[in-house]
Amino acid sequence: MADKMDMSLDDIIKLNRNQRRVNRGGGPRRNRPAIARGGRNRPAPYSRPKPLPDKWQHDLFDSGCGGGEGVETGAKLLVSNLDFGVSDADIQELFAEFGTLKKAAVDYDRSGRSLGTADVHFERRADALKAMKQYKGVPLDGRPMDIQLVASQIDPQRRPAQSGNRGGMTRSRGSGGFGGRGSQGRGRGTGRNSKQQQLSAEELDAQLDAYNARMDTS
């Protein structure tokens, strides 16, 4: 059997789908166009991450006095223009190779029919940018995927505040929550927040380089 790294995106999905259907009998299969990819080492299967603590826990000592930068907690991609036959397993399999996923699922209406969109949550923003750059505009089941980066999920660090009655520093809780999201509800198509703009390849490269540079210096 050929190495999966040399197979196309749709061929890998069809291979795994056939393995899952051993006891179901051979039904009709969808013909997927070949998608050329570079060789990649596939990571561990998708797993549910451990929940993050809701409350901030005090540390014994904090030597930093600025604390202006936020702590990145992940990034979300909105994938649209999907064929209605694409499943949750397909989305998880496509995007898991770029990094650890918090969630990857197709959106369905109340009757259980696919809306042709999917939400993909990555633990790392850099992984989301790589996936967006790799798959944006790539056909899946004959329909080019439209991928948008949703506002980053940032957890602001708590800043130490100067006490007026004491000579030392005391830690105070930041008032901000998850930043970057607009006040509008979730919409589809042109009704989404106007701040969600599609990024060009150059902008994606610039964001990815800036992220890697920041991680190298931290």
From Swiss-Prot:
Output the Gene Ontology cellular-component terms.
Answer: cytoplasm; spliceosomal complex
Which residue intervals make up region (Sufficient for RNA-binding, interaction with NXF1-NXT1)? 16-37
Per UniProt, the ranges with Basic and acidic residues bias are 1-14
Q: What protein am I looking at? A: Aly/REF export factor 2
| PTM annotation (Omega-N-methylarginine): residues | R24, R32, R37, R40, R171, R186
In this chain, where does the modification Asymmetric dimethylarginine occur?
R24, R32, R37, R40, R166, R171, R173, R181, R186, R188
Regions of compositional bias (Gly residues) in chain numbering? 174-190
Renumbered residue ranges of the record's region Disordered: 1-55, 151-218
Say what the protein does. Answer: Export adapter involved in spliced and unspliced mRNA nuclear export. Binds mRNA which is transferred to the NXF1-NXT1 heterodimer for export (TAP/NFX1 pathway); enhances NXF1-NXT1 RNA-binding activity.
